[in-house]
Amino acid sequence: MRAGPRRQHLLPPQDNRAAVGYQRQDPVIPPQRDLDDRETLVSEHEHKEKTCQSAALFNVVNSIIGSGIIDFSLILLIKGGALSGTDTYQSLVNKTFGFPGYILLSVLQFLYPFIAMISYNIIAGDTLSKVFQRIPGVDPENVFIGRHFIIGLSTVTFTLPLSLYRNIAKLGKVSLISTGLTTLILGIVMARAISLGPHIPKTEDAWVFAKPNAIQAVGVMSFAFICHHNSFLVYSSLEEPTVAKWSRLIHMSIVISVFICIFFATCGYLTFTGFTQGDLFENYCRNDDLVTFGRFCYGVTVILTYPMECFVTREVIANVFFGGNLSSVFHIVVTVMVITVATLVSLLIDCLGIVLELNGVLCATPLIFIIPSACYLKLSEEPRTHSDKIMSYVMLPIGAAVMVFGFVMAITNPQDCTHGQEMFYCFPDNFSLTNTSESHIQQTTQLSILNISIFQ
């Protein structure tokens, strides 16, 4: 392979490659730039460490659950890469819409995983602090079990070392562990829906479907279900990647993820209805030992998901500012800088709901609905009546509407947050509550039944 000239600062990828020495047989998507995802994340001496299909499956499932359920959109993305002869999301958009599209996509592709890293830190700090508070003899006000210390400690001991890997294939086993812990969490949430749900007062109109804030919910779901930003990374880590193999992998990943996400959301809402918080574990009582174990599993899960997002942010920075080629020193420097900034921001923000909404409508929605559809519509020579084009014509305006209206509603009608507060139904003593909401709902509930015995 020939060595291409080094790109200048902020220039998009061109049709050349660095002499890295990495090759694979029969590529479905030809090489397009100096140092692409395969070369950055799977170096020459690591060529034999390509992931098998099962490891890639767990990487995709982990990305979806932690952080796309949009099956068609994911396959459309890889098809667009095949049509354009590109092998990264950025190079696909650059080939389709030129430099302006490349810059816009780079900003979105950086912001989404970066904000996701912030949200994962918030979850880890909130969740694990409650776990350590349950240790006998530990003062709840102890600074060493506070969310700030836990965020810093988990960053230094776990997320930073894992994020320093150059090969995304090495995260396959980590993603398997994360997926297994997610299954345990699902079991705990289901158990508490049965044992705790009947004792939680239901809010009025709890079962009214598609209220006006449904648009905000779509934004949150977009945040949760996206893995488009790292799809090419996982695709490139496959042995002998093909569109057919990718389609099978995505179908299987989506089935697993849909099952877990639907059951998790349904059981959580069945338990708490209108009291449900952005972080579901904020709803459970601190003296619930079973949920405490679930919190521990949940905290570990988001910590293990964190590196997947860091890989993408680092790759975007490498492409835009360093021509795609990060030396060992700059690899460490960029990783440390990104994680440091994300950690500092997460220390200042403690409400998860608004983070999920804004990241969903502003970043995830374009990455899922708008950009893949627009690229495919411009590149494909299929007739307009082709099924792929029809779906693309449907997805594009839906994504634009969700983005605009979701942002307006997230700003004008932000989600309430009760971070760090014990919910009213957690008090073990007899308790009479009259709750008046904005819609003048009044509920009076005797909560004497909610004593410690419920949580044993």
From Swiss-Prot:
Task: Cite the InterPro entries for this sequence.
Answer: AA_transpt_TM
Q: Name one GO molecular function term.
A: L-amino acid transmembrane transporter activity
Places the protein is found: Membrane
Task: Write down the glycosylated positions.
Answer: 94, 325
Q: Where are the transmembrane segments?
A: 58-78, 98-118, 143-163, 171-191, 206-226, 252-272, 291-313, 329-349, 351-371, 390-410
Gene Ontology CC annotations of this record? membrane
Which biological processes are named by the entry's GO terms?
Answer: sodium ion transport
- Pfam families given for it? Aa_trans
Alphabetically sorted, this entry's keywords are:
Amino-acid transport, Glycoprotein, Ion transport, Membrane, Sodium, Sodium transport, Transmembrane, Transmembrane helix, Transport
Topology in membrane: Multi-pass membrane protein
Q: Where is this region: Disordered?
A: 1-25
Q: Which family does it belong to?
A: Belongs to the amino acid/polyamine transporter 2 family.
**Role:** Putative sodium-dependent amino acid/proton antiporter.
**Could you tell me what this protein is called?**
Putative sodium-coupled neutral amino acid transporter 11
Native organism: Macaca fascicularis
